[in-house]
Structure formats: C-alpha cells, structure tokens
Amino acid sequence: MLYNLLLPHIHNSHIANLFHYITFRSGLAIIITLSLSFIMGPILIKFLRSLQKNGQPIRSDGPESHQTKAGTPTMGGIMIILSSGLSTLLLADLTNQYIWITLFGFISFGIIGFMDDYAKVTKNNHYGVRGKSKLVLQGIISLIICVLLEYLDKNPSHLLNVPFFKNLNLDLGYFYIVFAIFVIVGSSNAVNLTDGLDGLATVPIAFTAGSFALISYLVGNLIYSHYLQLTYIPNTGELTVLCAGLVGSCLGFLWFNAQPAEVFMGDTGSLSLGGVLGIISVITKHEIVLAIVGGLFVIETASVILQVYYFKATQGKRIFKMAPLHHHFEKHGWAESKVVIRFWIISVIFALIGLSSLKLR
C-alpha cells in the first residue's frame, strides 16, 4: 500500500525513493512484523486463554514432560498471519499477482488450521478435523492456486529445475500441476508434523522463509538470475517482502513460544506457514530446493511415514520409540531444549546446503 501510494513521488523524494528498493522494504517488513508481534502477543495470548479453558489438549501417550504444558492456549498462528499479512499489504506492490495468490493460499491454509484447532479445543481431544477432510481441503486450495498460476502466466512453465546440475530441467508437462499440488500440501503437513516442541518449528521456518526471500529476489532479477543461471521469473522479487515478513513474524512469535511456551502456534500457524512456503517454491520454480532447505521437515515427515508402514507390516513393531522423530529423542532421555536446539542446528545446515545450490552448478 505504501509502495503504491509513494510510487508517483519516487523521483521527487529521497524517502519515497527508498520504497522503490525491495531490499529496503524487506528490512522494514522484518522490523514491522517484529513490532506487531510484540504488541499483539500479550493481548492475543490473554484473549486465547479466556476462550480456551483447557488450552491445547496434550496427548496422554506422549513424553511425560509434556503434561506440564496442559492449559497452554493454541491458535497462536493468528499472530503470525496477522503480522506478516499486514506488513505485506503495507509494503508490497499490491498490483503484483503473485502477492495476492500467495496471500490467498496463506490465509486459506490458516483457516483450515483454525478449524482443526477449534475442533480440538471444543472437543478437548487432540484429533480435531479428520485427516482426510483436511487433505481434501488442502488439495482443493492448492489446485485453485495452480490453476490461477497457469491462467495468469502468459507462458506457464512446466519445467522442474534440478539443483546442482547445470541446465538440467525436467519437462513434466501437465503432470507438473499434480506435482505442484503435492509440494504445497506436503509442505503444509510436513511443517505441521514438525511443530511438536516449544520453538522447534519456528526457527526452521524462519530459516526457510529467509532462504526463499533470497531466492525470490534473485529469480525475479534479470541480471542476477542470468549470472547464476537461474530461470528468470518476472515479478517474483516482490515475494521477498512477504518472505521477510514471515521471518520477522516467526522471530516475534518465538518470543512467546520459547520454552516454556506461553502459546502454541497450532495448526493455524503450522499449516499456513508450510503451505505458503510450498506456494512460493512453486512460483519461483525451486520445489526441490525447498525439500533441501526444509530438510528437517522432510526428515520429520519421513519418520512418521516409516513408523506407520513398518508398524503395519510387522504387526506392531516400531522403528522409533515414538514419531515424529523429535519425540523419539525425548523418549531416549534428551531434554526438550536439547532436541530443539540441535534440530535448529540441523536446519541451518540444510539451509546452507540449499542456498549453495544456487551457485554450485
């Protein structure tokens, strides 16, 4: 909004001219989202506590230490959606179609998560909305997004860029739409599975969003994309502002979510954040890089899939003491804070590997 209002005055004012730069607006987005989070946090937490008598239901079969979390309110993802959404509307170019498509997906996945959190709180159990129902809703939203991208792009590309290999692109044809839906839905649920400990998912999400802030900027810049031999996609640079807002929102939320958490992001936050990262990876054509940068999410998801299939195949045997993987280490006696910090370190490594693919070809 500010960018669009100040655009006519860019050449007449030094201050207005600053808003012409994506980097300036991205830095400002981090500051604004952090500030909004600090302001909204105490108010939202107090409000959620007044509505949720028992807070988020805690699994009885989980680590014993988790029983101390009883009464902690959920739906804290509302804070993330509001702060990053407002900063994007304030600082991004609102004539950019990618901004609106991404915000649509972000909010839509947030609504699905809110429905799930609401069901858990009102029914006082950890099941919420049926898994199949959530998958169907996620699939429908992802399909709408993919169709919009196909329709709005004059020359839609169905190429899958393979990182670390020079000029290796796989033409998936119209199967790419199915693949893109899988990426978006998979990303949403992978982040959701990772969000099981205080602060565990928040920092890796921030690292992933920060990585895609850089990717969006490079892919949307003709000179940099040509130099790095990346597929140039006009107008994706504005997504840098949105990604920067996500980084600030996650850091602001971590202030209240660090152990012992005052609030959980819930599915409202995890589904929306995972979904928006998937959408941005599809728009920027860096779907495989998302799997690398967000490698922690992939590992957590794989641990659940392996556990379920092995349990069924062996009629009751388990690979891990408990899935997702972070609970396995808790069952081994690791303190929650140790699991969280070590997983953060792993996410940093994955982010660096993913970003190195931009140059190593």
From Swiss-Prot:
Give the protein family: Belongs to the glycosyltransferase 4 family. MraY subfamily.
Q: What is this protein called?
A: Phospho-N-acetylmuramoyl-pentapeptide-transferase
Its annotated compartments are:
Cell inner membrane
* NCBIfam families xrefs: mraY (TIGR00445)
Q: Name one GO biological process term.
A: cell wall organization
* Enzyme Commission number(s) from the entry: 2.7.8.13
Any idea what job this protein has? Catalyzes the initial step of the lipid cycle reactions in the biosynthesis of the cell wall peptidoglycan: transfers peptidoglycan precursor phospho-MurNAc-pentapeptide from UDP-MurNAc-pentapeptide onto the lipid carrier undecaprenyl phosphate, yielding undecaprenyl-pyrophosphoryl-MurNAc-pentapeptide, known as lipid I.
